[in-house]
Amino acid sequence: MNRLLFNLFVWTKVPIAKIAGLRLRHLDDAGCQMQVTHGWLNQNPFKSMFWAVEGMAAEFSTGILAHRHIRRSGSRYAMLVVAMSATFSKKAVGTIVFRCDQGAAIAAALRLARETGAPQQVELRSVGTDESGEQVAEFFFTWSFKARMPLGTSQ
């Protein structure tokens, strides 16, 4: 998924993410980076970024990476966040980049889901850092992946 396709996807499926200022910074098989800049539309009363905007950027860094692996697999999967936790270590101001580098773990979970037919869960970590490289937040998302039957087949 390139930036143009990402923007089209966000505008049509999750427009609040675009309104909040989420941007795809980098995506390859190994990882994904999402960027969001603190501003009037995503602020909280404490002069920093609203925590849910941070969570949205963090979730996108894991979900877009999973989506890439699903598309490249040629198979169909259902994917769902089944758990989430977060810690916040510093006020989020300026530009924050959320990074997930667990593409290999996603690929392994998808492969196992396809081979066994059983849903697989994988916990993915997304770390948000500010412009100085300091960590502002850490999110953990547990994703469940279930292989679906190929189109045109029935059970």
Model-derived regions: residue spans:
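Residues located in well-ordered beta-strands
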Residues: 23, 85-87, 99-101, 127, ...
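Short connector loops at helix/strand junctions that flank enzyme active sites
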Residues: 19, 29, 57, 79-83, ...
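Short structured motifs
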Residues: 18-24, 82-88, 109-111
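Hydrophobic beta-strand-centered segment that forms part of the acyl-chain substrate-binding groove
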Residues: 65-104
